[in-house]
Amino acid sequence: MGKKPLNENQVKSLRKLVSGKPLHELLLNLSVDLMLRGSDLLNLKVSDVISENGKVKSEVMVKQKKTKKSTLRIPLSDHSIKTIQKHLMDKSRDDFIFKGQKSYTGKPISVIQYTRIVKQWMEMLGVDPIDYSSHSMRKTKPTVIYEKTKNIDAVRRLLGHSSVTATSSYIGVTDNSALDLARTYSF
């Protein structure tokens, strides 16, 4: 299954813990909402989330670099919209959203730095960071959606996966969880 996803309570706790830290607020909310690989997330620009007329977009269109598949259309939550309004409205549309402390370079933080931040968040939560990385953030929302709905095809589409098999493996649908589901619907 790889790195663990966060659960809803961990995300809610982190929102409080990172409040007031622009990079962390943006990274937390957008990484959970957009469900993107680190490289795709970090390459987002302000123009991806704010329209030409200066309004925050309700959906983000992203073409995943790894798969080069069709463009994904992903909705933004109220948390992300408010965070964008709070931290990005005065930025140039050409700016990367996730600029690091060396912002004079104009480049976004690296995936390595993103992983360090995620591990730092886990430490803030009192959780062993060994099982978490930037990829944990990509897995968080799809795992919660699957746990609540059991709709693996919807999750597959949100992640841009080509097969349900890949998605099942990715979010850790095990034989035991499938059997538990079958037991739930005995009649």
List the model feature ranges, each with a label.
Residues 1-187:
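Conserved catalytic core of the tyrosine transesterase superfamily
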